[in-house]
Amino acid sequence: YRRQRQMCIRDRRRASLMVKRLFDIVVASIMLAVLALPMLIIAILIKCDSRGPVFFRQERVTQYGRIFKIYKFRTMVVNANELGASVTVDNDRRITRMGKLLRKIRADEFPQLFNILAGDMTLVGTRPEVPEYVKQYSKEMYATLLLPAGLTSRTSIAYKDEDKILGNAANPDKAYVEEVLPAKMKYNLEALRKFGFAEDCRVLWDTFESVVGSERLSVTK
């Protein structure tokens, strides 16, 4: 009986992963079609605003520890990694004028829709970390690499103002590894236990509300 139950759970999880992948492809394709013109305008504005490429590419870690190149719209000056911490802090001088706007409305993440279509990422899942931070994972944290890295998650919503938290730290990189990362992983590990299509839909809706809600608040202020 136990073996049959395990096989049933495994088959159910496999089916959930197939539905998740199909959902990723459909939604990412629709979003890219809708955002094609806005993304073109953003690309032009980035080139007009500061010197450097339109896209920022960086090595990140996804499912089973595989390294991939993540794509974002560039929001910082060229060689920003050589000018400061690996993480971004509040009022970071490396961020460009256009970059501040893109980060505020999360539009810098749009190019990751291509990562999703390529199968490197999923719509909802643990945000991908750089290899140097993954090396700091505890054994429990490695469980988050059982699924593809995500565009958004409960953690992303809870820590959308992460840069402000790190802005008060004397050593942002150290504060991230020792304080922020373990706290974020609690959300990520809990998300693994709640894994399912319905939960993914709720996270996507909550992400939309979080971004739109923060914009309404800033307009009101």
Predicted regions and their residues:
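Single conserved hydrophobic/aromatic residue that forms the stacking wall/gate
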Residues: 1-11
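Active-site His/Glu-centered metal-binding helix of metallohydrolases
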Residues: 8, 22, 26, 117
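Juxtamembrane loop-helix boundary motifs flanking transmembrane segments in multi-pass membrane proteins
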Residues: 10, 14-18, 90-94, 109, ...
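Short, glycine-rich, amphipathic interfacial segments at transmembrane boundaries or analogous
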Residues: 56-94, 155-182, 186
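Polar-ligand-bearing catalytic/cofactor-coordination segments
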Residues: 98
